[in-house]
């Protein structure tokens, strides 16, 4: 699936991943390929992006929004 993690200042990550784990106001959530459409508000927490090569990118986010649609996870970090 395609993943983009962006802040107002820069693109933090853009690429392919197998899984994304983040925390919303409703708790931790994991996204895999084919996930149903989703929109949520992020809280301060670590977001982990699992890349196709087996490595993991970690981002400490202060909050923001996450949207999942058409096999794409978009994270707008604050």
Question: What spans do the regions from the language model cover?
Answer:
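Compact, glycine-rich, soluble single-domain proteins
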Residues: 2-78
């Amino acid at each position: 699936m395609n993943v983009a993690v962006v802040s107002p200042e820069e693109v933090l990550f853009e690429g392919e991943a197998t899984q994304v784990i983040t925390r919303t106001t409703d708790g931790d959530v994991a996204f895999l390929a084919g996930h149903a459409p989703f929109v949520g508000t992020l809280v301060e927490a670590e977001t982990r992006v699992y890349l196709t090569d087996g490595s993991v990118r970690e981002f400490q986010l202060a909050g923001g929004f996450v949207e999942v649609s058409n096999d794409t996870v978009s994270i707008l970090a604050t």
